[in-house]
Design a protein with these regions (language model features):
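Nucleic-acid-processing active sites and adjacent nucleic-acid-binding tracks
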Residues: 63-99
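Active-site palm subdomain of RNA-directed nucleic acid polymerases
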Residues: 203-213, 555-579
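Conserved catalytic core of nucleic-acid polymerases
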Residues: 227, 248, 280-283, 298, ...
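Conserved beta-strand -> loop -> alpha-helix junction used to position metal-binding or nucleic-acid-contacting
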Residues: 117-134, 141-142, 420-425, 610
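Short active-site loop/helix that positions an aromatic residue
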Residues: 38-41, 105-116, 128-132, 272-279, ...
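A common structural junction motif
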Residues: 475-476, 594-604
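Conserved "right-hand" nucleotidyltransferase catalytic core of DNA-directed polymerases
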Residues: 1-74, 119, 136, 146-149, ...
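Acidic beta-strand-to-loop metal/phosphate-binding motif
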Residues: 31, 96-104, 387
Length: 620
């Protein structure tokens, strides 16, 4: 029987640390899980790239053997750290053994701080769980094991001891004696092992092996991206911040002179007061609150709203993209984190990346100073920054599927792509409208946008937008054909598949009627039928967008794996339809472009535009 550091023994534990280090040679699969002291996890993201925090113990399971090896519990009960790490290193660096994690990025990141490289094929039960259902509310190990195994971790001793000590059972685990953590930690590894076995059956049953393999190969790419980070020119960043502050103050002064009062940029009430003082009208929400959309402010003819927009951009650049970046810098490098797939920390249902700590995907694209902010991002020393953009990636994917579906008019658009013509100009010619309108309407169709939202974007009446959308669908039939085909598929079977077989599910239901200005919550089928009676699948109007976004994710992720495995290049950053890398020469840049254009064969040619320069801003 063991006791904690403070010799409080109300809650007791029978758990003892292991005394053996069995060989894992010949084992096909081993599951590994880490317990950590990661005190800045919730505020700054995982601490491993910044060397903030530590590993307090490692659990391992081969199914028939499971053990937790504590090495740095502040409460005591630790084993010889050198012996443990030598053993864990021998297992992790044996490339004949497949390794399983639940959230692999986190665990292999922390293992790297112990100078342990995880070799062999990487599996992730978190990735498998998301591929099997991207619409879950929770992806924790407990949630997944409860659903698939009917098991979960026994946290009774851990929680009771933590409560006795006045600690948080998860965040403060490192402060506790290992005997109160051991049973919980062992379950982490054993349940991950058992869950992996079950999920692989489900992955095969759902024909998701190909996309699962790609996602697993991508784990190592993203880990290396995060570990290396991006060089940041902080001197340039601070100089730019001063320039932005001066410019913002000029706009604020001009607004004060114009309206006779201070304007708080991010307060709709303050902006409304400023509008009132100069007798300008503005829209309101359904509940009557002032509403200032970006489109409204940018397209207004008066000076005031345009100044509000410009000042907001300058303010956000300072707060989000200079101060926001600066606090994450470690040794002049930024280690932003990527949500590879849907999970408890974020991610998207489509398979596209999301980023956090910080979220670089919010970087403004069309802004005078957005380019200046990007100039603080540098390639590796002595190398060049390549920014490679897919040209009209989503319209090309739409056309690819329209051709496979034999939609009328799709061949004409394919021929335009082959000739290097612009997609939106082609649809504009087909609809006999200006390119600007064709682009807005076409993207609206792809994104499932209704005519009311389109009316706002085009600054026309809802009835005009409705008529224009109807005419567009008639004259550009391949888009309407795809929209209807994908929606019908989603309605009939509840799923659609992307370019590489990723499933998009529509498994929630809503009333089969519509009442203006009334919100109905979507629910699982039985619950919805009990609540509403006559129901239909929810969200199927987004099916085409899900297909295109998910396929774009497939193409982009396949590119990243190929660039890493075939060229030995670890990307710096991936945003939207853009891949950024550090390359040694123009030739390497051309090699990246070639892989991007040919990684997946489409019914239309993929086109990539790229620049090789000295920083991100100049390459964009």
């Amino acid at each position: 029987m063991t006791y904690d550091l403070f010799n409080q023994n109300i809650v007791k534990s029978e758990w003892l640390h292991p005394t053996e280090f069995p060989s894992m040679k010949g084992r096909k699969v081993v599951a590994i899980d880490l317990e950590t002291c990661d005190t800045t996890l919730k505020t700054m993201g995982p601490g491993w790239p910044r060397k903030v925090g530590s590993v307090i113990g490692i659990s391992i399971s081969s199914g028939d053997f499971t053990a937790y090896y504590p090495i740095a519990h502040q409460g005591g009960g630790n084993m010889d750290e050198k012996k443990v790490l030598k053993y864990i290193k021998s297992v992790c660096e044996d490339d004949s053994i497949q390794k399983v994690f639940h959230n692999a990025q986190y665990d292999i990141g922390w293992l790297s701080t112990l100078d342990i490289e995880v070799k062999g094929y990487l599996h992730d039960t978190l990735i498998a769980s998301a591929l099997l259902n991207e619409n879950r509310y929770a992806y924790t190990l407990n949630a997944m094991c409860s659903e698939y195994l009917g098991e979960w971790k026994n946290e009774k001793v851990l929680k009771e001891k933590a409560e006795e000590l006045g600690l948080d059972s998860k965040a403060d685990m490192y402060k506790m004696h290992s005997s109160f953590v051991g049973e919980y930690a062992e379950a982490d590894a054993l349940l991950t092992y058992k869950l992996h076995e079950r999920l692989m059956v489900e992955i095969e049953k759902d024909a998701l092996e190909g996309v699962y393999d790609m996602e697993c190969r991508l784990i190592r790419v993203i880990f290396n991206m995060t570990k290396r980070g991006i060089r940041i020119d902080m001197m340039r960043a601070m100089d730019l911040k001063q320039k932005l502050q001066i410019k913002e103050k000029k706009y604020l002064k001009r607004m004060k002179d114009l309206t006779g009062g201070e304007v708080q940029l991010w307060s709709a009430r303050s902006v409304a007061d400023a509008f009132d003082r100069v007798n300008l009208e503005y829209p309101h929400t359904v509940l009557g609150a002032p509403s200032f959309t970006q489109t409204f402010l940018e397209t207004h003819k008066h000076e005031l709203p345009r100044m509000v927009t410009k000042a907001r951009v300058l303010n956000k650049l300072q707060g989000t993209f200079i101060d926001g970046i600066a606090k994450y810098i470690h040794n002049d490098r930024l280690h932003a984190h990527v949500n590879q797939i849907r999970g408890d920390s974020g991610g998207t249902v489509t398979g596209r990346f999301s980023m956090y700590a910080p979220n670089l995907q919010q970087m403004p694209i069309r802004s005078e100073f957005g380019s200046e902010v990007r100039k603080i991002f540098l390639p590796e020393q002595g190398e060049y920054w390549i920014s490679a953009d897919y040209s009209q990636q989503e319209p090309r994917l739409l056309t690819h599927f329209a051709i496979l579906n034999k939609n009328a008019g799709a061949d004409k658009v394919r021929e335009a792509f082959i000739q290097g013509l612009d997609f939106h100009q082609q649809t504009a010619d087909m609809a006999d409208i200006p390119r600007r309108l064709a682009k807005t309407i076409g993207l609206g169709v792809m994104y499932g946008m209704g005519y009311k939202k389109m009316a706002v974007d085009l600054d026309i009446t809802p009835m005009e937008a409705k008529a224009m959308l109807k005419e567009f669908r008639i004259k550009v039939p391949f888009m309407q054909g795809m929209l209807e085909a994908v929606m019908n598929r989603a309605n009939q079977v509840g799923t659609i598949r992307t370019l590489l077989g990723r499933k998009c599910r529509f498994d929630m239901y809503e009333p089969n009627w519509y009442e203006p200005n009334k919100f109905y919550k979507s629910m699982p089928l039985k619950q919805a039928e009990a609540e509403y009676g006559n129901v239909k699948r929810a969200g199927t109007y987004k099916a085409l967008n899900r297909l295109i976004q998910g396929s774009a994710a497939d193409q982009t992720k396949k590119v990243m794996v190929d660039v890493y495995e075939k060229l030995g290049i670890t990307p710096l950053l991936q945003m939207h339809d853009e891949l950024n890398c550090s390359v040694k020469s123009d030739k390497e840049g051309a090699d990246v472009k070639n892989i991007m254009e040919n990684c997946i064969k489409l019914e239309v040619p993929s086109k990539v535009e790229y620049k090789v320069k000295d920083n991100w801003g100049n390459a964009k």
